[in-house]
Amino acid sequence: MRQALHALLLASLSLPTMAAPHALEEIVVEGRKTPLLGLARSASEGVVGAEDLALRPLLRPGDVLEAIPGVVVTQHSGAGKSNQLFLRGFNLDHGTDFATWVDGMPVNLRSHGHGQGYTDINFLIPEMIDQLRFVKGPYHAELGDFSSAGGVHFETRRRVEAPTVSVSAGSNGYERLLAMASRAQESVLTGALEAVRYDGPWRDVEENLEKLNGQLALTRETEAGRWRLHARGYQSRWHSADQIPARAVAEGVLHPLGALDPALGGRSHRFSLGGDGTLRTALGVWTAEAYVIDYRLRLWSNFTYGLDDPARGDQFEQLDDRRMAGGQGTFSWGEDQPLTQRLGIEVRSDVIDNVGLYRTVARQRQEGFRDDAVDQTSVALFYEGAFSLSPRWRSVFGLRADHYDFSVRAADRLNSGGARESQLSPKASLIFSPSETLEAYLSIGRGFHSNDARGVTLRIDPQSGNAADPVDPLVPSTGGELGVKWSPRPGVNSALALWQLDLDSELLFVGDAGNTEATRGSERWGVEFNNFWQLTPAWRLEVDLSWTHGRFQGNAPEGNRIPGAVPFVASSTLSYAPSQGPFATLRLRHLGAYPLAEDNTAKSRGSTLLNLALGWRWPRLRAQLDVLNALDAEDHDIDYFYASRLPGEPEEGVEDLHFKRFEPRQLRATVTLTL
């Protein structure tokens, strides 16, 4: 690994300084400074720029998602695994109802070995993010699968102003090296390389995270448009300390930072090629994006210890090995007319050679529960029209049609088969602008998420051998939002939104078990209040509040609370960032207590986390110290409530709180040199 770090450093130093080409104009992304008045289609959408992200101390790459107001990022496993996400009363698991895209490539993985919509953004290099554009709710025609709660588009930097090398070291064996550079003539060639090592603070397991990450892009811009070709490569391996039972800690058997199974962890890679382009013609604007992706994950977990197999333990492996290809094209016209229109098409094909679930001991396979191959294809057409009704009124209306084909070749032929399903999703917004500083929005729409193809064709439970009911291929949702955006002066903006989202009842495929379970329909509504103040040219403050009420529909005997539905989230970021000299950022995040059981008898107590970054900036040098979990809080990063079995416990196990603690306070120092 250290040899790789040295090679990366030498490679970065060999890149020449970029000369700015005449064909590329400078684009300044204002991020949260930009109120989007006159542009937004709903009150809760927004933009976060590179400047916003650069000020944040980050424990892991996934933490960049917390720049979206109301989003909470946690981790119940190792540093190489996808994060657990919370938004608008959803425990999104690893991304089921939140769509994520990077440079036109989808990140959510359908029919994934671990969980539907699995979203792993560990391949993102935070310093290479130019901006992220986010929306919430199912009101936007360009977003389809997994977007009921919202979605985000990451756009990475097309050029780096000067070659840059960044070296980091910190607590628990943390090491990181990053190199970025561009070379420009008629086209701009931009590359970045990253290497990371991390052992973690856990008592019984060293994470031994080793990650290599790189991206390369070639961009050319002309008067008529712009095109880009890009390539990415990411691979990592790690060990993990997963969530642990609270009773073992209370009895002194296990340390709060301990682990019961030292052989957990994973290996993953993601390689991609892609391209995108924009062409302006007399008729309108054409855009196109295309990609191919090679992805693989092997993940070892153990959540119940000895509940299913007291002799060998309950460790299991999940495998996902796939190729993806697809793209999107749009045509927009009427830019200077009262009616601006956009027509788009989106296609995607997932060829999954092997998606499996196996019983293991110390990572060695003992038997298989699922060993399948899946082909899943989707085609979508969408239309959106924005009509200026008067100087104060405008409307946006859209319609999206999605069609899915599922094909499964299962080890058990009874679970093989195919299915087709279509979904029509109307969207609409009405916007009123009483002044140049204020807009009010009313938005409604229909969305959906797809289900795991293995659940769509399921006939026999692979563990019990009993008959099983298949899941619905597509599960619809319906939502609405009423809100306002207000920007009384440049650098000050606020957004207030009252929203509701209903999901149909469904049978859900459980990737950890290979079977299905019934879930009831749900209703969620809430209020969000987001604020940004540029107090002075150097000082800025963000305060975001989110409150949610979530319940299952009906009055079942077991109760109607939604496990993992967080009722309150608050976050605030205070930054001092002059162009040179000292700088500092203080970031506070509070996650309110939330139910872990439908009858509300088990609850998470919530958590509060404070991170600090401080440093000094010179013309070509920057030194920064991150203090993560600055108060050394012992709160839980995430909580679950379920039955597990330890040695000597009854056959049916013990229902208990299972948690993963915050990582203790740690320091990370970074020196960045601009050549």
Label every model-predicted segment.
Residues 62, 66-109:
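Extracytoplasmic beta-strand/coil segments of soluble accessory domains associated
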Residues 106-136, 154-155, 471:
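Short acidic/polar hinge/loop motifs at secondary-structure boundaries
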Residues 136-141, 150-183, 193, 202-203, ...:
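Short strand-turn segments of transmembrane beta-barrel domains in outer membranes
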Residues 171-197, 203-241, 263-285, 333-335, ...:
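Transmembrane beta-barrel wall of Gram-negative outer-membrane proteins
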Residues 221, 226-234, 266-411, 431-433, ...:
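Face-selective signature of the C-terminal outer-membrane beta-barrel domain
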Residues 276, 285-303, 433, 439-447, ...:
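Membrane-embedded beta-barrel scaffold of Gram-negative outer-membrane proteins
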Residues 331-334, 395, 404, 493-503, ...:
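Gram-negative outer-membrane beta-barrel transporters
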Residues 593-597, 616-675:
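C-terminal beta-signal and adjacent terminal beta-strands/loops
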